[in-house]
Amino acid sequence: MHKDVHVTAVDCDAAALELARENAKAHALDGDDDSDDALVSIRYADMLDDHSMALLGSFDLVVCNPPYIAADAWQDLDASVRDYESHGALVGSAPELDGLGYYRRLCWLYEQGLISLNESTLPASPGALGTSDLPCMVMEVGAGQAPTVRANFETARVQQAHGGDHYVTQCDVWHDSAGRERVVVVWRRGGGGHGGG
């Protein structure tokens, strides 16, 4: 891992956080008690709780694999998944049971600024990509969910920190090795309305 990269790993499950701490320590990425020299910080936050999300600080890039299995699809999962994976990690506890609740929540957090993204990654001129052409969010999605998630983010209205125009959010969909739509990638571009293409 590059010394200038700092990762904040976030989860709401105590067992997952403990395992992440063990992994960071095993790979000498943990520094000294979550100090500034740590390359990986492990933090608790619940995506459904505004306060815990607001305490996280700001990021250049958010990578997320939220629960996306619909509640009624749990029993139909292959036993190799259902019997060994956490129900909370796959289905979660979002009020909506269609598997899209966490994406709606992510989009709302993005619009409200509760997922705080660094201004330094934004382009100097409207319409240009930001520093290093980094997206601001990368999210794994379930089968058939990419079009809805993409549409939600492309119509998101995110106010620029200094006022003025809203950011323009543009999305792309990446496919896995089997050709399935697997990841929605979000870019935030400077000024000029909202929407995307």
For the regions a language model picked out, list residue spans one by one.
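Conserved SAM/SAH cofactor-binding pocket of Class I
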Residues: 1-74
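Short phosphate-engaging motifs
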Residues: 16, 77, 145
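Short amphipathic alpha-helical segments
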Residues: 21-22, 74-78, 150-153
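Conserved Class I SAM-dependent methyltransferase catalytic core
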Residues: 94-188
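Flexible, glycine-/basic-rich loop-and-beta segments that form/coincide
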Residues: 190-197
